[in-house]
A protein has these predicted regions:
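C-terminal edge-of-domain segments
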Residues: 141-177
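Cys/His-rich metal-chelating microdomains
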Residues: 184-187, 203
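Extended, charged helical/alpha-beta scaffold domains that provide interaction surfaces
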Residues: 123-151
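Residue-level signal for inorganic ion chemistry
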Residues: 14, 59, 109, 181
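Short cysteine-rich clusters marking metal-coordination/redox-active sites
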Residues: 178-181, 197-200
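Glycine-rich phosphate/diphosphate-binding loops that line cofactor/substrate pockets in enzymes
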Residues: 113-118, 175-178
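Acidic, turn-prone loop/beta-hairpin segments
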Residues: 19-108, 115-130, 155-157, 162-168, ...
Length: 214
């Protein structure tokens, strides 16, 4: 049971969601900027917990991982259970809803991909029509929503009718692709022979772009 829960967490929440999302921060944000450091801090805490979780199940792997990850000479089996210094306030229901929304967006993108209309999800622009309650729930993410859904642009609206499920419309972006982050953006600038977006230009110098730390 414990092994299955850990495997599901690594496959679903990490592999299919979080790690996919933070690639943009890891590869395109300033290397010492707060946006990239935020995701690195999250990964640090995740590894602290994950190595402890797997230690009773795959002990040698856990010990090897601990030696690579930590400068601590002691064994992982000498460590206490890892707890964050301060508990994080997070609305888990909203995040579960966001994962479900991302799954639905991906299904729609996959249909276009099978038709040959689209390649990468970053080729897509998404418009989502919500009920009023769902609009308030998701609009709080602002510009961060396009990074969470791995698309180039997201626009939201409120339906004048009752909706049980969000209505998702996807179109292929007509904007040019930034040569650095691969997002499609209306206005690109020439920078040392490369056509890149204003976000990437800001990320070339410290501290880089301002992002919600999620």
């Amino acid at each position: 049971m414990a092994f299955q829960k850990i495997l599901n967490f690594c496959t679903n929440e990490l592999g299919s969601f979080y790690l996919d999302i933070i690639k943009d921060r890891a590869y395109t944000c300033h290397h010492d900027g707060p946006a990239r450091k935020s995701s690195q801090t999250a990964m640090f805490h995740l590894l602290q917990m994950l190595i402890r979780w797997i230690s009773p199940i795959i002990s040698f792997t856990a010990e090897e991982a601990w030696k690579e990850f930590s400068n601590d000479e002691s064994s992982i089996f000498e460590k206490e259970w890892y707890l964050l210094v301060e508990p994080l306030e997070s609305d888990l229901d909203v995040w579960n809803d966001l994962i479900n929304l991302k799954d639905e967006v991906n299904k729609n993108i996959e249909i276009l991909r099978e038709e040959g209309s689209i390649g990468s999800s970053l080729d897509a622009e998404v418009h989502i029509t919500f009920s009023e309650n769902d609009f308030l729930k998701f609009s709080r993410f602002g510009e961060e929503l396009k990074f969470l859904l791995l698309v180039s642009n997201v626009s939201l609206s409120v339906s004048d009718k009752d909706l049980d499920e969000p209505k998702i419309d996807i179109k292929v972006s007509i904007d040019e692709k930034c040569e650095r982050c691969w997002h499609h953006v209306a206005d690109l600038s020439d920078h040392e022979g490369n056509k890149i977006c204003s976000r990437c230009i800001s990320n070339l110098s410290f501290p880089g772009e301002a992002r919600q730390m999620i």
